[in-house]
Amino acid sequence: MIDLNALCSECGVKFYADELISENSRQIYRVYITKKNGVNLDDCEALSRLLSPILDVEPPTSGAFTLEVSSPGLERKLTTPSNFENSLGELVKITLKNGEKISGEILSFKDEILKLKTAENNEISVNFNEIKKAKTYIEW
């Protein structure tokens, strides 16, 4: 199994997430990376050059695929504890498993507990296991 965290570190970036999708009957393996002060094209190219020969030997799927390396974007899904830890100070919209929707600024994430400050300046805590989906957002 490929250690994407270690390979990303070699390129000076952090591994965020990966996915294998099918678009127009093509398999695409996407690797998302982050970096303080933002990811640039050179970062994506460096990781792509490092990953390509490794994926030729250990492909993420059977058959042909295209490798894409990019930033997850300003508005992105938060699916893992490390996604939340790396998004401190950002705004997030969350849907809980019980259907309740909440939003606010991420204050902290520790021991699987997310602390948010809502628009009403209330501080709330949410257990990671209660989150159905979460996504950062930008106020323009």
Swiss-Prot record:
Pfam families: DUF150_C, RimP_N. It comes from the Bacteria. It is found in: Cytoplasm. One of its GO terms (biological process) is translation. GO terms for cellular component: cytosol. InterPro entries: Ribosome_maturation_RimP, RimP_C, RimP_C_sf, RimP_N, RimP_N_sf. Its main location: cytoplasm. Keywords: Cytoplasm, Ribosome biogenesis. Coiled coil: none annotated. Required for maturation of 30S ribosomal subunits. NCBIfam families: PRK14639.1. Belongs to the RimP family. This is Ribosome maturation factor RimP. It comes from Campylobacter hominis (strain ATCC BAA-381 / DSM 21671 / CCUG 45161 / LMG 19568 / NCTC 13146 / CH001A). The lineage of its organism: Bacteria, Pseudomonadati, Campylobacterota, Epsilonproteobacteria, Campylobacterales. The gene is rimP.
